[in-house]
Amino acid sequence: MATATVLEKANIGVFTNTKHDLWVADAKPTLEEVKNGQGLQPGEVTIEVRSTGICGSDVHFWHAGCIGPMIVTGDHILGHESAGQVVAVAPDVTSLKPGDRVAVEPNIICNACEPCLTGRYNGCENVQFLSTPPVDGLLRRYVNHPAIWCHKIGDMSYEDGALLEPLSVSLAGIERSGLRLGDPCLVTGAGPIGLITLLSARAAGASPIVITDIDEGRLEFAKSLVPDVRTYKVQIGLSAEQNAEGIINVFNDGQGSGPGALRPRIAMECTGVESSVASAIWSVKFGGKVFVIGVGKNEMTVPFMRLSTWEIDLQYQYRYCNTWPRAIRLVRNGVIDLKKLVTHRFLLEDAIKAFETAANPKTGAIKVQIMSSEDDVKAASAGQKI
């Protein structure tokens, strides 16, 4: 086992449970285990996690205790958007060395089932996805993980490295939706995934792009990211079809939504909310597509006959596969800039406050990052690379 860096701080993690408690406590592997290489399996490396983003699913596991069939059944560590430094490697690992900066792709697959063997490993029948019960997540100071799922990020900041996970979600959607250069595109929802999808759609050449949300502040934030994006504030009292008319009106510079009006070929649905999915369906052109990235309730009602008579494809996404190298290139080469998305930063020991901030709409939080040291928090907040 090769090691680097003087390790001094104990391992702690951010836990929830069936009672919806949230706390910070000692976590595995222990500091002594990390120093001595105990528990490091063949093919694994130990990572000192330096930055982790809070995902909406983390908040949902805390508040609701489940997402569909994925249920918290005991003490459970959250977090799956992380980057850090390799501090130890198993003897058989040759692709990484202590000191390497990496982003963690948070899955472990079986490499034996049909999805794995056909390259769609996000559908692995035996997947262990970090932070999805019962598999503990990355919100801890040290973690062991297979080297094959640790992607070198070079001189990229750990903060950007942690944002590669939500970017991968967006890239998977853009690719599978078939979005083309010059396509009119609708993005529903200006949360973190919607905003990253907006950046990705712009990079892919979509034009014009309209983004929707119920929060005017988030729409203003979207315009700060992509100044020429058009925005539509969803009206709560209107039907899905009526909101769609408003969306089409925005696509047409206020000239209405009647026959001949420009409609999006692709709608990237990033909320998972039934009314938003329905509005997207009512918005797209004949032969268009509604691509659902957002996670919603187990069952929902959609305008079936609109889908049928307008030949609209309704397509879904589950996580991602084979996206991380591309995501790294896009960020490293400046094609997609994610820095503005981070609005709040907290120390690992202050994770409860971080989660409260992420969960409260009044804070204006977009992406909340949790970092392993006070120096990292101060440096990142000052715009310095960590």
From Swiss-Prot:
EC number: 1.1.1.12
TM spans (from-to): none
GO BP: L-arabinose catabolic process to xylulose 5-phosphate; sorbitol catabolic process
Binding site for NAD(+): 192-193, 213, 218, 293, 317-319
Oligomeric and partner information: Homotetramer.
Function: Catalyzes the NAD-dependent oxidation of L-arabinitol to L-xylulose in the fungal L-arabinose catabolic pathway. L-arabinose catabolism is important for using plant material as a carbon source. Not active with NADP as cosubstrate.
Stated name of the protein: L-arabinitol 4-dehydrogenase
Source lineage: Eukaryota, Fungi, Dikarya, Ascomycota, Pezizomycotina
